[in-house]
Structure formats: structure tokens, C-alpha cells
Amino acid sequence: MTHLFALSELPLDEIHRLLDEAEAFRSGRIWRPAAPMYVANLFFEPSTRTKCSFEMAERKLGLHVIPFDPERSSVQKGETLYDTVRTLEAIGVDAVVIRHHEDAYFEALRHAVGIPIINAGDGCGHHPTQSLLDLLTIRQEFGAFTGLTVAIIGDIRHSRVARSNAEVLTRLGANVLFSGPAEWKDETNPYGTYVEVDEAIARADVVMLLRIQHERHAETMGLTKEEYHARYGLTLERARRMKSGAIILHPAPVNRGVEIASELVEAKASRIFKQMENGVYVRMAVLKRAMEGRMEHGRMAEKWHVVQ
């Protein structure tokens, strides 16, 4: 079964293949299913970019998208995630995309369902498609990863983006720096070195900023937004000390004037909206992989063909 739960489960050659496939879609390659195939997006947390990006990718591939709203589903009556996914499998859905607030929600499904599951974010755990689109954006800029310095700045402890990216970037040969408030350090993450924010920004080829994950905090932040920006944000002054050719990334949503000065969101060095564009192509590649795995596993052999 061709699930995608975490990039840490994929060998580097498969990650490179996904990036190559995404680049091919970006260059205009068109794929279509030879017969109807169905996918459901189960988002148990709010989302704009990931949800809409998956839906765009699904439609570009000619997949049929089954509407699903947790607030108007039997989840509200106590139905479990497992029973929800098994129901969708039973009625003919070929793959599911899931975002869930629970870390590693997918472990209960890994060997229990017969359709591919794509993780669109699990609590503070993993966000594999975000990492893939970040990797694609970095590769487009620098051509390779070996020797690059990537500074991940902000709410490290509560960020699935930080966790996913630090692991895969380290495997790819990049040097990862972390920076942010001491109380938001992630001591369980073995990848990356903690430095002060000014040092991180000055050394980085890639400055990756993170949103404060207020919804995952047990306590309120002890700083005002203005204080956080001054101490840990990418201010205009700090941006002037970035290396020549360095780029700015952010998984979004962006809190302007908090983790990044508003003027920098669309500055020359920013690739924030390029990340969003790349997200569609990356998710097309991931969905294609999932559907091919579905065909090999079950009832739909020889389902895809290339449209030249």
C-alpha cells in the first residue's frame, strides 16, 4: 500500500523521484485516469493552502473529489476515524487525504485499511507534502541541498513543518539551524543546532519562518506580537543582514508583523507564494504515486495513461 505518512519513511531516491515528477507536472505534463477514480479529503483542522492545493491537484489529475465536512458528518455522532475511512473505502473511494489534530493518527490505520492514505498534517508530528514543496522550492533555487544552511526560526516545538524539514534536509546534506524562544525548543528533535536568531539569519541560505502555533499551546505566549517580532521575527533590519542570494520561506498562514515584517512577504528574496504554487505540483505527484499504488494493490490495474 502506497501510503504517505512521513518523509522519514521514504528513501532519498523516492523523494527525488517525487520532486522530479512534480517538476514535470510544473512543466506541463498531463496525466488522466483511464477510468473514474475517487478521493476524499478529510480535514479535521482548519486549512486554506493544503486543502485547496490538494483539491486543485486532484482536479488537474482528473480525479473525482468526494466532499467531506467533519462538522456535518457522523464524526459528530461519535464515529471513529477508522470507521470513517473504512466507510469511504467500502463505498468505493480510492484514496483519502487526512489532516488531524492527533499526532500519528495514522498508526491506527496503517495496516487496517486497503486504500492509500496521504498525511496532510498530524498534530505536531509530520507534514510530508509541505516538506516536499519546500524541497522543490529550494532545489529550484540552488540546484542541490548538500552544503546549504537552512535556518528554521520560530515555534520549533509545536511545528510539524520544522520536524519534517529538519529530518529530510539533514539526510539530503544540508546544515540545519534552529532559533526561537527557549521555551519552544524541541529537545526531542536530534536534527539541527540551536543558535541566536541574528546568527541564524546571517548564516542561512534559506530562512524558513514558522507561525506561532497558538492552538497547540497549553499557556498563552508571554510576549506581545510586537515584542515577538522584535526579538525573533525577520525584521527589515535583520533582512538587510541576510546573505546575498538567500531566500525566505514560510509555510503560511503568515502573521505579518509577527514572524516576518509585512514588507518582506513579497520582497525579492521571498519565495512564499512560489511555495504555494509548487504545492499543487508536489501534491499531483503524491496523488499519482498513491493511485498507482492503489492499482497495484487492488482492483484497478492499468488505470493510468499519459496524455501527450
UniProtKB/Swiss-Prot annotation:
Residues noted as binding L-aspartate in the record, renumbered to the chain: 77, 160, 211
Enzyme class: transferase
Transferase keyword on record: yes
Keyword annotations: Pyrimidine biosynthesis, Transferase
Gene Ontology terms for molecular function: amino acid binding; aspartate carbamoyltransferase activity
TM helices/strands, residue ranges: none
Catalytic activity entry: carbamoyl phosphate + L-aspartate = N-carbamoyl-L-aspartate + phosphate + H(+)
GO biological process, one term: 'de novo' pyrimidine nucleobase biosynthetic process
Keyword Transmembrane helix: no
Pathway membership: Pyrimidine metabolism; UMP biosynthesis via de novo pathway; (S)-dihydroorotate from bicarbonate: step 2/3
EC number of this enzyme: 2.1.3.2
Residues where carbamoyl phosphate binds: 49-50, 99, 127, 130, 252-253
Xref: InterPro entries: Asp/Orn_carbamoyltranf_P-bd, Asp/Orn_carbamoylTrfase, Asp/Orn_carbamoylTrfase_sf, Asp_carbamoyltransf, Asp_carbamoyltransf_Asp/Orn-bd
GO cellular component term of the entry, any: cytosol
Annotated function: Catalyzes the condensation of carbamoyl phosphate and aspartate to form carbamoyl aspartate and inorganic phosphate, the committed step in the de novo pyrimidine nucleotide biosynthesis pathway.
Family assignment from sequence similarity: Belongs to the aspartate/ornithine carbamoyltransferase superfamily. ATCase family.
Assembly and binders: Heterododecamer (2C3:3R2) of six catalytic PyrB chains organized as two trimers (C3), and six regulatory PyrI chains organized as three dimers (R2).
UniProt protein name: Aspartate carbamoyltransferase catalytic subunit
Lineage, top ranks: Bacteria, Bacillati, Bacillota, Bacilli, Bacillales
